[in-house]
Amino acid sequence: MSHDSDDKTFPYQKDDAELRRRLTPMQYEVTQHAATERAFTGEYTDTEDAGIYKCVVCSTPLFESGAKFHSGCGWPSYFKPLNGEVIDEKVDYSHGMVRVEVRCNHCGAHLGHVFEDGPRDKTGLRYCINSAALNFESRPENE
């Protein structure tokens, strides 16, 4: 699923040649063509350090470690984004399913999908995000 046919315009306009140079092949395919990394292979699946997860394309802060939980699905999971402005959600009809795609609201990078099977004592949502779409910035818990 490529974002080429998408009508939404995002504030950060990406240069494809620059992205191909800067990103790994997996990061490029995930963020620009909505590929999915294999379950349990992502760099941040089991990361428990305190910090912020940012968009690998534009460095927009997306999720904080306090919202991360172990869902057992094989991808980093969060019960909420950093705030309501950083995520764009779009219905995804690919692969014979109906899901909600999650994209960076600043650059349009594909991040993953959101499902309604997250922790009931929090938001009830599970943002299932590809590690390849993220960069992690470690920081002390009290910041």
UniProtKB/Swiss-Prot annotation:
<keyword id="KW-0560">Oxidoreductase</keyword>
<feature type="domain" description="MsrB">
    <location>
        <begin position="16"/>
        <end position="139"/>
    </location>
</feature>
<dbReference type="GO" id="GO:0006979">
    <property type="term" value="P:response to oxidative stress"/>
</dbReference>
<keyword id="KW-0862">Zinc</keyword>
<feature type="active site" description="Nucleophile">
    <location>
        <position position="128"/>
    </location>
</feature>
<dbReference type="InterPro" id="IPR002579">
    <property type="entry name" value="Met_Sox_Rdtase_MsrB_dom"/>
</dbReference>
<dbReference type="InterPro" id="IPR028427">
    <property type="entry name" value="Met_Sox_Rdtase_MsrB"/>
</dbReference>
<feature type="binding site">
    <location>
        <position position="55"/>
    </location>
    <ligand>
        <name>Zn(2+)</name>
    </ligand>
</feature>
<dbReference type="GO" id="GO:0008270">
    <property type="term" value="F:zinc ion binding"/>
</dbReference>
<feature type="binding site">
    <location>
        <position position="58"/>
    </location>
    <ligand>
        <name>Zn(2+)</name>
    </ligand>
</feature>
<feature type="binding site">
    <location>
        <position position="104"/>
    </location>
    <ligand>
        <name>Zn(2+)</name>
    </ligand>
</feature>
<comment type="similarity">
    <text>Belongs to the MsrB Met sulfoxide reductase family.</text>
</comment>
<keyword id="KW-0479">Metal-binding</keyword>
<dbReference type="GO" id="GO:0030091">
    <property type="term" value="P:protein repair"/>
</dbReference>
<dbReference type="InterPro" id="IPR011057">
    <property type="entry name" value="Mss4-like_sf"/>
</dbReference>
<dbReference type="GO" id="GO:0033743">
    <property type="term" value="F:peptide-methionine (R)-S-oxide reductase activity"/>
</dbReference>
<dbReference type="GO" id="GO:0005737">
    <property type="term" value="C:cytoplasm"/>
</dbReference>
<feature type="binding site">
    <location>
        <position position="107"/>
    </location>
    <ligand>
        <name>Zn(2+)</name>
    </ligand>
</feature>
<dbReference type="Pfam" id="PF01641">
    <property type="entry name" value="SelR"/>
</dbReference>
<protein>
    <recommendedName>
        <fullName>Peptide methionine sulfoxide reductase MsrB</fullName>
        <ecNumber>1.8.4.12</ecNumber>
    </recommendedName>
</protein>
